């Protein structure tokens, strides 16, 4: 047990170094690829709780998202806004700016693919993140198709701090069987209750 725990800590530290993550981030082994990471984010971002409380939740997705970045948001009841494809092949930024204006009190999440696994188009991560954060929304980048080929940085620019990224190590050389990875800013997490109560979550349980 202790040996495996040390290996897991070393793996977390190595991933954090590669992705520019610091103490303000959590590296989470989520399970089955990026799909599991996104489903975990639905909980961590407090989406279902916000909807249950009557708060508007809007999720902005790109023109070429995988089902793993569509269905988790749709199934939780969020409003989905799909951006059109621009002439350059990425998401249409004029539509993005409009979609970010969801009204006072709304929870807005922008969830985009860093690279299309259909066209190979690579998004301008820093530019898009800058616009999203300036509007007060949360930014998720799905690197499932791009992680083996692209650099990943939680802050690609000083004014472009990404809230979360997900990727699928099973798509790397030697990666089959590896757990999906979610890296999330701790201050972006709205619901800290464990997704699955059980071993390792006892400190969250009340004595009553």
Please place each PLM-identified region on the residue numbering.
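Pyridoxal 5′-phosphate
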Residues: 1-208
């Amino acid at each position: 047990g202790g040996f495996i725990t040390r290996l897991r800590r070393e793996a977390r530290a190595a991933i954090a170094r590669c992705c520019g993550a610091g103490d303000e981030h959590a590296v989470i082994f989520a399970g089955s690829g990026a799909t599991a990471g996104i489903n975990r984010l639905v909980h961590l971002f407090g989406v279902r709780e916000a909807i249950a409380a009557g708060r508007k939740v809007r999720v902005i997705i790109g023109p070429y998202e995988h089902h793993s970045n569509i269905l988790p948001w749709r199934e939780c009841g969020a409003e989905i806004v799909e951006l059109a494809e621009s002439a350059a092949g990425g998401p249409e930024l004029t539509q993005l700016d409009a979609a970010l204006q969801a009204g006072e009190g709304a929870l807005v999440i922008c969830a985009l693919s860093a690279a299309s696994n259909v066209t190979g188009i690579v998004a301008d991560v820093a530019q898009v993140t800058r616009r999203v954060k300036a509007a007060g929304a949360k930014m998720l980048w799905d690197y499932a198709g791009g992680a083996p080929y692209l650099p990943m940085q939680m802050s690609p620019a000083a004014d472009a701090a990404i809230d979360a990224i997900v990727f699928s190590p099973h798509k790397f050389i030697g990666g089959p069987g590896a757990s999906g990875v979610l890296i999330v800013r701790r201050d972006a997490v709205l619901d800290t209750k464990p997704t699955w109560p059980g071993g390792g979550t006892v400190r969250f349980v009340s004595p009553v």
